[in-house]
């Protein structure tokens, strides 16, 4: 799986808005519709994969992703919430100007786009810090 910043933003928004179950159901439905049309789809895999990344990065707490080979997903949830870092990253990803700045910085420096770069680019975009 490749990291997809839009999917990560969707995951963080689902947590913030307390609609994890609805987001998972929507991903499952997209997969069902694609399969019924004879197409291959990985929406559920992508959503859970990015939820796992968010948990691993300390952006989300109270959510455990469970995998059952070959590709069955499940989860255990307690009090699911964004951490302060999760809120900060979500704010950065919502800022079109800041996110475009981060992409430009990463591209010009030939470095991968990281969480820290996204946050710093947002600060620069709003004039808080000069890079």
Regions found by a protein language model. Give the residues of each.
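Non-catalytic, well-ordered alpha-helical scaffold segments
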Residues: 5-9, 45-48, 80, 84
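Exposed, interaction-prone assembly regions rather than primary DNA-binding/catalytic cores
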Residues: 91-131
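Accessory beta->alpha helical hairpin/"wing" motif in late/C-terminal subdomains of nucleic-acid enzymes
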Residues: 65-92
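Short linear capping/connector segments at secondary-structure termini
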Residues: 28-33, 65-71, 104-107
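Basic amphipathic alpha-helical segments that dock to polyanions
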Residues: 46-60
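Generic structural signal for hydrophobic core residues of well-folded globular domains
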Residues: 15-19, 54, 58, 90-93, ...
